[in-house]
Amino acid sequence: MSTNSYYSSASSSGFRVCPPGVPSKCWCGEEIITFTSKTKENPYRRFYRCAIAMKRENEEHLFKWVDEALLDEIKMVNEKCKRVVENISDLRMNVMANMELLNKNAKQMEEELIKKMEGELLTMKENVEELGHVMAKSALKTVGVAVVIVASIVWLWGRV
C-alpha cells in the first residue's frame, strides 16, 4: 500500500460497509491505498481508500480509517486468542481424562498380573513339592529294588 495525501471529510458511515480488520482490496477488486486526511475535522488521520474511488467519486468504494481498521484487527486477534485458549483448555481436560483412564487401566493390569503370577507361583510350588514326594518315593523304590537284587545275589552266591 502506498501513502498519499487526500482531502477527505468523509466518515466511514457514508460509504459501503467494509470488511472487519485491515482491508487488502476493495469490493471492486482494486488495491487499497493509504491516504492522510487534511481536513479540519480529521487532520493527519490516516485512512484506506480504493484507487478507483478517486476517479469515480459517485460510486461507493472502500473507505476505512486506519485506526478503526487496526482496532477491528486487534478485536479479531483477541477473539481468536480466546478461542485458542478455550481449545487448549478443552484439549488439556481431554488429555487429563485420558491420562487418568490410562493410569486406572495400568493399575488394573498390574493387579491382574500380580494375581496371575501369584497363582502361577503357588502352582509351581505345589508341583515342586509333589515332584519332591514322587522323587522320594522313587528313591525308596530304587533302594528297595537294589536291596532285593543284592539280597538275591548274596543268596545265589551262597548257594553256589
Curated annotation (Swiss-Prot):
Entry keywords, A to Z: Metal-binding, Zinc, Zinc-finger
A GO term for molecular function: zinc ion binding
The keyword NADP appears for this protein: no
Alphabetical list of InterPro entries matching this protein: Znf_GRF
Binding site for Zn(2+): 26, 28, 50, 61
Zn finger limits (GRF-type): 26-69
PROSITE patterns associated with the record: ZF_GRF
The name this protein goes by in its record: Uncharacterized protein At4g04775
Species this protein is from: Arabidopsis thaliana (Mouse-ear cress)
